[in-house]
Amino acid sequence: MPRYRLLIEYNGGPYQGWMRLPGLQTVQGALEAAAAQLDGGPVEVTGAGRTDAGVHATGQVAHMDLRVDRPNKVADAMNYHLRPHPIAVLKADRVEEDFHARFSAIARHYRYIVINRRAHLTHDQGLAWRVPSRLDADKMHEAAQSFVGTHDFTTFRDSECQALSPVKTLTRLDVARYNDRIEFTCSAPSFIHRQVRSLVGSLVEVGRGRHPVKWAREILEAADRTRCGPVAPSDGLFLERVDYPAG
């Protein structure tokens, strides 16, 4: 059967995460229901990133196998059957049968958005974390560089994480301020459960002035989950892009 690669965006607010769960509304479940209507039978949709409840995506990638062999129609047909879900298939391409959205990926890129102001959120409600106290973005960026590279991220590993190893390689963790908007950009081949939100929550503690810059390295080297700062809420996290080998 033809295999299709999907580029997907969604507002994760209404969903209990990506993964299909009996009796709960999930992104994978909504996509599989739409694909079943398109293809006339059960379809498994496999995603590159298994985002948590409330986490959004602007560049999630998934694959599925269909009996339908109409590449130019798949995206429009999926979007028709997805209504009124806040999920959109931006693109659908035929790919080789050995392409796997999760296991073929070589990098994943996340962005976390903080709105640093006292006033409550309006347009960004549900799409950012509002932090009313003034944050020092330069100190957060400096502290973040302690996390770049290959490390044991036990401190930032959720207790529910099922990964075999806490060792991961961050290739980028930048923090930048744009007026009252602060963006955390994080890239790695793969992540452990809630790693990005754990990192952001700890960096915000530095930004608030509750800990010095050197604290970031200290808690990393401690390899102790109890040393992690508060986990940032899911609202501000976006899976922005997934990379694959050229060709």
Swiss-Prot record:
Binding site for substrate: 110
GO MF term set: RNA binding; tRNA pseudouridine(38-40) synthase activity
Root EC class: isomerase
Alphabetical list of Pfam families matching this protein: PseudoU_synth_1
Active site annotation, chain numbering: 52 (nucleophile)
EC number of this enzyme: 5.4.99.12
UniProtKB keywords: Isomerase, tRNA processing
GO biological process, any: tRNA pseudouridine synthesis
Entry function: Formation of pseudouridine at positions 38, 39 and 40 in the anticodon stem and loop of transfer RNAs.
HAMAP family, alphabetized: TruA (MF_00171)
UniProt protein name: tRNA pseudouridine synthase A
Lineage: Bacteria, Pseudomonadati, Pseudomonadota, Alphaproteobacteria, Hyphomonadales
